[in-house]
């Protein structure tokens, strides 16, 4: 953008002023455009643009004061990459109009309190950094900023508060220090010393049980640090302090106006008042820093040094990359362009490596990735398109680094890598140097590397044809080739009676007979049978139906809908029929995992089966053989999540009905005494109906929550039993030596990781019931490492 174009908007505002009074909204839009663009790259320097913008805005301060303050507050919240641009602007305006600076500070404090009450923690943190940086631009005194940060520290030391709340306040202080640390050290050294000591004391006393649970790789299995986020940031701040607060990333535009700003009158920043904690407040989960590359990993591709782990520059670069991604999370093309522009603005650092490290760090973040998987997948593709000479090599290095550590990787992170890499390969005709990974073929079936490669191949099969995938693989990989995804029709041809019954059902399907006919055909003729329908013939009925509908997904859906009444009537009669239905579904579509997953989900949506039947089936001993496969845990988590969503809907209905009835009662209390409720019978009846609905929903919620608790307890007990069984098997599946302790075998470590995966996948629900689970699920014989895993999980919300 040219310098002339930047200030065309200002000229337009001036022309409208001369022509007559413009619409206020038009002027506000122009002001927003002018202020919002001041930090952009233009033909002139940012300092020059700030100087001109200050002169322009000063003329309008009295007329549009509120609008200008609102716009600056918005920039402070949503443009954190331009903090110093806008703090300099406020400083220059404050030097010309002291009251304006005070009004801005008052507005920012009010906005911060509002954001915290709405639990918008990142935005509130952006304002804290902005307020602190106002000390560098001559708006606020260093003494008051020190007191402001000390009030955050005090909030973190309040008694009987969740650790995650206290962590947030300490993190806020640490994040402010790269901007204001030098100023505080020079002008408020005693406060700076107090802040440093208090943070050190807090970190020393803090519970760190959660760290191992949130690490992508098992502790001690890699040379890369997997530090707690607060510990890492504190170490970076300490290194910065020892370097006399010298960093190379923050553009301090106010230094160009030092003479003007140092003579300005300064304001005092009020102390921070932490919002009252309530039980329904949800704070950010603790984080573990993700590191993939060291300087040696980059040396083959770039002569530029990578900032070290303890360097504050690493933190600042990662923060800006993360912000660019957050801002453009709905536009992959714009996101990729801005990331490349950021890399070009910082030629002295191999930003490409930090971009991929940040993307994969987000993709693998525990307990939840911040963005949908498809966004990260498409963003990587877009980056490769825009930088085809460099970024493909960095991506290959990224994949190889992760593959080398796959054996110690959390199962849920392997799942995410499988989802991304299979999608990625589908855009390149599944071409890859597969032979580089043939070492996994000689490892245990439960080793992370073999599971990763096997599941990638299976997922690729879902994206493309079976023949195409097999053709792309080396001959050596036949051991982990997926089976042909065809329906299996397992009927013993020598059993004449069984064949005849199958033919009967086939003919009935062809004649499209109604549900009643099938129900009559399935009725048990055995007087001693306690079940109303013959369970074996029901399994045969399902098998024939699936065989006849096996051509496409649409045929399967059509069959399920056509015979929904038959299926539901039989399955409602006993849980045993639901088990039989799922067992038959598995036996027919065992080699087509995608069909298994889709049809199970469809049966749940149609309410033919319920969540408990699915969970019981998946953790039946007969299904243990599938517990090294990704599809099983996808089905499990979908079923459990479906129940949680149903509970959330009922909770929402209760909240709305409660508000509705309370408002109605309040309205009646506010009415004049001569107006009675019985004068309007319709309102009275509606009010009674709302109260009745509210009570019914409360009872329904209580039943559902009780059912959910029982379901989780039963399933976790079954899972622990399987893990216990794996621990008692002291022989590695591959070497047969019997020298490997049961709790160190790949199978045990994998199942333990899956146990952690389920806890994290349903963290919000399970944390509500964690005390109940601890009492009812764990027994004296439970493996200590499983109890340790659960204790780590509980510490997420300490």
Swiss-Prot record:
GO terms for molecular function: mRNA binding; RNA cap binding. One of its GO terms (cellular component) is nuclear cap binding complex. Residues 28-241 form the MIF4G domain. Its main location: nucleus. Residues 668-682 have a biased composition (Acidic residues). GO terms for biological process: 7-methylguanosine mRNA capping; miRNA-mediated post-transcriptional gene silencing; mRNA 3'-end processing; mRNA export from nucleus; mRNA splicing, via spliceosome; mRNA transcription by RNA polymerase II; nuclear-transcribed mRNA catabolic process; nuclear-transcribed mRNA catabolic process, nonsense-mediated decay. Pfam families: MIF4G, MIF4G_like, MIF4G_like_2. It is found in: Nucleus. Keywords: mRNA capping, mRNA processing, mRNA splicing, Nucleus, RNA-mediated gene silencing. Disruption phenotype: Lethality in 63% of embryos. The keyword 4Fe-4S does not apply. Residues 663-686 are annotated as: Disordered. Component of the cap-binding complex (CBC), which binds cotranscriptionally to the 5'-cap of pre-mRNAs and is involved in various processes such as pre-mRNA splicing and RNA-mediated gene silencing (RNAi). The CBC complex is involved in miRNA-mediated RNA interference and is required for primary microRNAs (miRNAs) processing. In the CBC complex, ncbp-1 does not bind directly capped RNAs (m7GpppG-capped RNA) but is required to stabilize the movement of the N-terminal loop of ncbp-2 and lock the CBC into a high affinity cap-binding state with the cap structure. Component of the nuclear cap-binding complex (CBC), a heterodimer composed of ncbp-1 and ncbp-1 that interacts with m7GpppG-capped RNA. Belongs to the NCBP1 family. This is Nuclear cap-binding protein subunit 1.
């Amino acid at each position: 953008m040219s310098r002339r174009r930047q200030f065309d908007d200002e000229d337009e505002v001036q022309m409208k002023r001369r022509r007559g009074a413009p619409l206020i909204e038009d002027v506000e839009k122009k002001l927003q455009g002018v202020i919002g663009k001041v930090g952009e790259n233009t033909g002139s320097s940012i300092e020059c643009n700030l100087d001109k913008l200050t002169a322009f805005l000063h003329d309008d301060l009295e007329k549009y004061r509120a609008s200008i303050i609102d716009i600056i507050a918005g920039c402070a919240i949503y443009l954190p990459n331009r903090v110093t641009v806008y703090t300099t602007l406020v400083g220059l305006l404050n030097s010309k109009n002291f009251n304006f600076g005070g009004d801005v500070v008052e507005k920012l404090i009010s906005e911060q309190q509002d954001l915290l009450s709405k639990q918008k923690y990142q935005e509130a943190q952006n304002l804290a950094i902005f307020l602190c940086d106002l000390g560098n631009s001559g708006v606020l005194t260093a003494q008051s900023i020190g007191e402001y940060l000390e009030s955050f520290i005090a909030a973190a030391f309040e008694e009987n508060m969740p650790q995650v709340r206290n962590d947030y306040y300490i993190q806020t202080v640490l994040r402010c220090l790269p901007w204001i640390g030098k100023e505080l050290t020079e002008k408020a050294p005693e406060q700076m010393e107090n802040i440093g000591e208090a943070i050190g004391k807090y970190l020393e006393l803090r519970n760190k049980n959660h760290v191992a649970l949130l690490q992508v790789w098992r502790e001690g299995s890699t040379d890369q640090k997997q530090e707690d986020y607060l510990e890492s940031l504190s170490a970076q701040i300490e290194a910065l302090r020892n370097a006399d607060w010298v960093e190379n990333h923050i553009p301090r535009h106010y230094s160009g106006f030092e003479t003007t700003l140092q003579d300005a009158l300064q304001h005092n920043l009020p102390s921070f008042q932490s919002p009252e904690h309530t039980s329904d407040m949800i704070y950010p989960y603790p984080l573990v820093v993700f590191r993939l590359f060291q300087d040696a990993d980059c040396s083959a591709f770039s002569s530029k040094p990578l900032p070290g782990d303890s360097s504050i520059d690493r933190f600042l670069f990662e923060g800006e990359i993360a912000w660019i991604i957050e801002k453009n999370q709905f536009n992959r093309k714009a996101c990729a362009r801005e990331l490349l522009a950021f890399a070009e603005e910082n030629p002295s650092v191999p930003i490409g490596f930090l971009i991929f490290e940040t993307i994969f760090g987000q993709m693998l973040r525990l307990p939840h990735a911040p963005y949908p998987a498809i966004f990260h997948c498409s963003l990587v593709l877009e980056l490769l398109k825009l930088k085809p000479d460099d970024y493909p090599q960095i991506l290959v290095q990224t994949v190889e680094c992760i593959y080398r550590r796959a054996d110690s990787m959390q199962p849920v992170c392997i799942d995410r890598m499988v989802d991304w890499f299979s999608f990625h390969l589908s855009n390149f005709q599944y071409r890859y140097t597969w032979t580089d990974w043939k070492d996994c073929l000689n490892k245990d079936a439960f080793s992370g590397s073999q599971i990763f490669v096997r599941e990638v191949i299976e997922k690729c099969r879902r994206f493309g044809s079976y023949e195409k995938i097999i053709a792309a693989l080396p001959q050596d990989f036949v051991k982990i080739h997926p089976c042909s995804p065809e329906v299996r029709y397992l009927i013993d041809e020598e059993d004449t009676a069984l064949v005849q019954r199958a033919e009967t059902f086939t003919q009935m399907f062809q004649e499209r007979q109604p549900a009643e006919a099938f129900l009559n055909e399935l009725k048990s003729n055995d007087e001693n049978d306690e079940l109303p329908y013959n369970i074996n013939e029901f399994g045969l009925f399902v098998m024939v139906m699936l065989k006849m509908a096996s051509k496409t997904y649409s045929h399967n859906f059509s069959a399920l809908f056509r015979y929904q009444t038959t299926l539901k009537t039989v399955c409602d009669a006993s849980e045993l029929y639901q088990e039989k239905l799922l067992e038959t579904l598995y036996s027919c579509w065992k080699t087509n995992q995608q069909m298994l997953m889709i049809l199970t989900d469809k049966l749940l949506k149609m309410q033919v089966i319920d969540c408990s039947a699915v969970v019981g089936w998946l953790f039946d001993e007969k299904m243990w053989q599938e517990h090294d496969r990704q599809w099983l845990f996808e089905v499990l988590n979908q079923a459990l999540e479906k129940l949680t969503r149903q509970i959330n809907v009922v909770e929402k209905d209760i909240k709305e009905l409660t508000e509705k009835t309370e408002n109605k009662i309040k309205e009646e209390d506010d009415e004049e005494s001569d107006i009675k409720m019985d004068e309007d019978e319709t309102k009275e009846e509606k009010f009674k109906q709302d109260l009745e609905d509210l009570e019914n929903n409360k009872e329904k919620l209580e039943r559902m929550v009780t059912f959910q608790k029982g379901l989780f307890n039963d399933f976790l007990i079954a899972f622990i039993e399987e893990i216990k069984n794996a621990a008692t098997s002291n022989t590695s599946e591959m070497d047969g030596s019997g020298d490997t302790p049961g709790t160190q075998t790949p199978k045990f470590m994998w199942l333990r990781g899956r146990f952690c995966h389920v806890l994290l996948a349903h963290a919000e629900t399970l944390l509500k019931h964690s005390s109940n689970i601890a009492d009812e699920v764990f027994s004296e014989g439970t493996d200590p490492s499983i109890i340790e895993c659960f204790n780590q999980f509980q510490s997420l919300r300490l």
